Regions:
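Catalytic core of Fe(II)/2-oxoglutarate
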Residues: 185-244
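Double-stranded beta-helix
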Residues: 149-203, 208-209
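N-terminal accessory scaffold of Fe(II)-dependent oxygenases
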Residues: 1-174, 221, 227, 231-294
Length: 294
């Protein structure tokens, strides 16, 4: 990967943009190899797969009942109107050398602003049947989508537009983990539209609503995402605000008053430490995790 225009450094987590990569046609990502990956299991997962037509405004639970096994869904994906997301593929021994280097390369391209903020990273392989729609949704963490095979369109909305996603909806998103987003009536066309061919990619900032439409072939893509310390702080603030709201208060959204945010973070961290000392539930992903080299 290269960044001759400097967009990785300039626009990372601020704006969506396209880029080129050299993974198109890589034989590691042929369907037979991915079906074998699904059968191996190991430290990967939890995976997601669903079959059957879903509209742009549909939900992630649609099509998860009565589906084929994961390996069979991958093998027959040309004909079964499915989406498959294989998670934590950077932990598989066959894929680790390539994908863990990719995680490092993107951080290096993006520079110190990202490097100082990254706590962990993950690579998912995303497969789509011809004409398949990925529903409108948001992800908290910034991501880089790299198309390896096929053609599809991805539609990305402005992550800072509070007329699309209100402050209260953001609180629900971060505090509850509600990944699905509700698209405002008449706003589906207010996106930046990117038509991707194999060898192209797009960066989606954290919190940016987006949806995708595959074209006439099976598509295979990578979703490279990063857990950021700044996003974890934001999530903590939204959860703290939610507790205050339950007490009948009306807290200011994060970012309005930085000094209040600092007080909330200190209080939340003290509460979480006390809870952990008394055997409270621990958060975070289970299993091996990629972390940036020192």
């Amino acid at each position: 990967m290269a960044d001759p225009g400097g967009r990785f450094r300039r626009d990372y987590n601020r704006a969506n943009f396209t880029f080129k990569h050299g993974l198109a046609g890589n034989t590691l990502f042929e369907l037979s190899a991915l079906a074998a990956l699904a059968r191996r299991g190991g430290a990967l997962g939890p995976h997601y797969w669903a079959s059957g037509a879903v509209p742009a405004g549909g939900g992630w639970s649609d099509g998860t009942v009565g589906r084929q096994t994961l390996p069979d869904t991958i093998t027959n994906i040309e004909h079964n109107d499915s989406i498959v997301i294989l998670r934590s593929v950077e932990q598989d021994p066959m894929f680790a050398p390539l994908l863990q280097n990719l995680l490092v390369d993107i951080v290096e391209l993006t520079g110190e602003r990202m490097r100082a903020d990254v706590a962990a990273g993950e690579v998912a392989v995303v497969l789509n049947s011809p004409e398949r729609i990925t529903p409108y949704h948001m992800d908290a963490d910034p991501a880089f989508h790299l198309l390896i095979a096929g053609e599809h369109a991805i539609h990305v909305f402005d992550h800072a537009d509070r007329t699309l996603v209100s402050a209260r909806e953001l609180e629900d998103f971060y505090a509850v983990g509600r990944r699905r987003a509700e698209c405002r009536p008449g706003r589906l066309n207010d996106s930046n539209d990117h038509e991707l061919l194999a060898g192209a990619g797009v960066h989606v900032p954290g919190g940016a609503p987006h949806w995708a439409k595959n074209h006439g072939q099976v598509s295979i893509a990578l979703r490279v995402s990063y857990v950021l310390r700044s996003v974890e702080r934001l999530r903590t603030l939204h959860r703290f605000n939610r507790r205050l709201r339950r007490l009948g208060l009306t807290p200011a959204p994060p970012g309005v008053a930085p000094w209040r945010d600092r007080l909330k973070l200190a209080a939340a961290n003290s509460f979480n430490a006390l809870r952990a000392s008394h055997g409270g539930a621990a958060g975070g992903r289970q299993g091996p995790v990629w972390r940036p080299p020192k």
